[in-house]
């Protein structure tokens, strides 16, 4: 047994971080700065909570659902497994994917676990089509399996949303399409509208959050170091009154001997002076 170490599973946030297609940028002002005031004081004048690594609250999609300040801290903490389920261009995470990946983790998935799903897309985190426009995602069947069969506490994805991109208003749902080119590309590739294959608006959001199962989007940081492992997990929110979700600091508490040591430390190109 090695010592316990903390592994950051979060992307940095701030001005310049990658943005979901409809999200506005951070606007940050320096009210005081060192040369003049001998202190630094910054204000966020425009701050989108559904940015970078964040947890959605039920009120985000469920009428009269719980707001962030109403959720107990226990919801954001507990034993976890990180499943290695490689996915790419518009692929779906299936029930079979989850069950097969769980067999490779100590103890499998147990009732009340957090399940962190590592598709490898965290490595493409950036303002590019791979991460956003062509994002894979969780199938309806897999979401139901996690909630009703496996009875998990929460699910975190290294993806742009809890849902496949074609279940969102980036495509044909709600006020969409915010990214009309993916609709045209899908029609050219498959010969029909994506709406035929992805008819519901954010079904995975509704399945998870509608049953008080937590959901985290954009898991990142050094998640590749804990892939295939069991550990303790936390992703505590800001105590935002009436919030529908907040940026979180997702962290794995794990024995250092269990780390995937061939994975280098994650270095981000943005947020570097």
PLM features: what roles do these ranges have?
Residues 1-273:
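Active-/binding-site microenvironments in catalytic and ligand-binding cores
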């Amino acid at each position: 047994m090695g010592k316990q170490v903390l592994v950051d599973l979060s992307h940095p946030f701030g001005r310049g971080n990658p943005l979901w297609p409809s999200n506005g940028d951070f606007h940050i002002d320096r009210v005081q700065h060192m040369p003049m005031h001998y202190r630094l004081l910054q204000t966020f004048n425009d701050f989108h909570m559904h940015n970078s690594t964040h947890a959605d609250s039920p009120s985000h999609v469920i009428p009269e659902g719980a707001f962030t300040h109403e959720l107990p801290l226990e919801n954001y903490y507990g034993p976890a497994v990180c499943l290695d389920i490689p996915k790419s261009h518009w692929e779906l995470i299936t029930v079979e994917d989850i069950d097969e990946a769980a067999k490779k983790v100590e103890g499998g998935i147990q009732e009340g676990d957090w399940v962190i799903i590592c598709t490898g897309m965290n490595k493409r985190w950036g303002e590019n089509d791979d991460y956003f426009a062509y994002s894979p995602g969780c199938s309806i069947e897999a979401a139901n399996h996690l909630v009703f069969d496996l009875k998990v506490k929460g699910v975190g994805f290294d993806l742009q949303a809890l849902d496949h991109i074609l279940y969102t208003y980036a495509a044909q749902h709600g006020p969409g399409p915010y990214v009309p080119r993916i609709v045209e590309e899908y029609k050219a590739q498959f010969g029909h509208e994506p709406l035929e294959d992805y008819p519901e608006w954010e079904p995975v959001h509704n399945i998870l959050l509608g049953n008080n199962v937590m959901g985290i989007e954009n898991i990142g940081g050094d998640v590749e170091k804990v892939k295939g492992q069991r550990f303790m997990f936390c992703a505590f929110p800001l105590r935002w009154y009436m919030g529908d979700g907040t940026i979180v600091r997702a962290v794995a508490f794990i024995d250092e001997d269990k780390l995937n040591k061939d994975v280098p430390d994650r270095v981000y190109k943005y947020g570097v002076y």
